[in-house]
């Protein structure tokens, strides 16, 4: 069996990080909506692939997540054994850690498997400092 070198796309996914840039309109609340139709991971019980469309909606604070970085980050799930619930929650945790948004919602709409259709929705609301 021939051992092949890592392909450039695999290397980009492995080295990818969630990159942010300054919000160009920090004084205005606006919503960024991103659709990621090719999310894949593996079932931690069977090893079968799971497919989903992820919908990300957020109101940025001081930082915005760069789109190519999100794509590479999402592609890193392809070979991970992770449940639907944990996958969507982990994506939320990682994106919130990267950009600290005012608000973020992620919906994972997983393709039916075994006659079961799963949709997982998670939200984050930025904590504001108490006035007291």
UniProtKB/Swiss-Prot annotation:
Chief subcellular location: cytoplasm
Catalytic activity: 7-aminomethyl-7-carbaguanine + 2 NADP(+) = 7-cyano-7-deazaguanine + 2 NADPH + 3 H(+)
GO terms under biological process: queuosine biosynthetic process; tRNA modification
EC number: 1.7.1.13
GO MF term (any one): preQ1 synthase activity
Positions annotated to bind substrate: 65-67, 84-85
Compartments, record wording: Cytoplasm
InterPro entries: GTP-CH-I_C/QueF, NADPH_dep_7-cyano-7-deazaG_red, QueF, QueF_type1
Alphabetical keyword list: Cytoplasm, NADP, Oxidoreductase, Queuosine biosynthesis
Superkingdom of source: Bacteria
SUPFAM superfamilies noted in UniProt: Tetrahydrobiopterin biosynthesis enzymes-like (SSF55620)
Similarity annotation: Belongs to the GTP cyclohydrolase I family. QueF type 1 subfamily.
Name listed for the protein in its UniProt record: NADPH-dependent 7-cyano-7-deazaguanine reductase
Provenance organism: Thermosynechococcus vestitus (strain NIES-2133 / IAM M-273 / BP-1)
Gene name, Swiss-Prot/TrEMBL: queF
